Amino acid sequence: MSMLNDIKIAYKFGGMEQKLIFWNVGAFLVSVVVWYQFRLGVFLFPTEVKLLADFSHLAYHPWTLLTYGFFHASFFHLLFNLMVLNFAGKLFQTFFTQKQLLGVYLLGLILSGLGFVLAFRFLDFGLSSGLVGASGAIMAVLVATATYAPQMNIRLLLIGQVQLWQFTLVILGIDLLQLFTENTGGHVAHLSGALFGFVYIKLLQQGTDLSKIISGFFDTLAQLFGPKKKNAFKKVHRTYQKPAPKPAMKVVIKDKTQQQIDDILDKISQSGYDSLSADEKEFLFKAGK
């Protein structure tokens, strides 16, 4: 099976965190082709993509509250963010749905961007060349999970077992210590995303799910632009004939195939797509056609 088919299966049957990883990697590859200056060794993102600390610019480029989060300043910037996203996203989906993860991620992206713009508007942080990166959104997911299940045990390489609140507190502490040293705008965005993650869980525990803002928006788009459902009731005149009994073997085979698909999907949800064997990946690809 080709690598392309392998990627298609991973995207189709993976969790929301995997889809977000694919989106970020795809955007990074585009940015390398379009905006990377190989002689200088840096990206020169246009103002139509990155987020500027300027309300007047934001008023005419509101989409940058989303686009900035899907581009990264370097490969290692992307790699670290996606490692944390994969880790935090899986933990989040232990308790919540994929729709909620997408909602927290995108709202965290928007609000961390607004925090960045507000900080440079009302606080004297000097000049900023703009903001890119998904760190604020990822911090929202991580802090939301830590707020909901602070005592959850996680195992870290070279460190061992710690509780989720301890790991999250260290990450937040690093941002606070670096707030006035370097990349001030980035750290403000991280902390803004973290604050949203905390507020999201507190409101959720009181019965208000802010992620429905995002899921409701996408549901509305699907209703407006999705395929129209055909009328389920259609008057048909036909001569009645007693249907011939269907072979039992066909039903058994269908049930067996569906059971095998369900078993593979359960394996993906528990251990990830990479845990599948080559035969299982091939079977899933053929079944998905």
Q: What role is predicted for each listed range?
A:
Residues 1-16, 25, 175-289:
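C-terminal transmembrane module of polytopic alpha-helical membrane proteins
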Residues 4-8, 85-94, 149-155:
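C-terminal ends of transmembrane helices
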Residues 13-132, 179-189:
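N-terminal TM1-TM2 helical hairpin plus the immediately adjacent luminal interfacial "cap"
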Residues 79, 134-142, 188-195:
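Membrane-embedded alpha-helical segments of multi-pass membrane proteins
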Residues 89, 144-148, 197-205:
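Hydrophobic transmembrane alpha-helices
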Residues 94, 147-161, 205-212:
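Alpha-helical transmembrane bundle and helix-membrane interface signal
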Residues 106-108, 159-163, 167-172, 190-193:
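Central hydrophobic cores of alpha-helical transmembrane segments
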Residues 127-148, 162-164:
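Membrane-interface micro-motifs in multi-pass membrane enzymes
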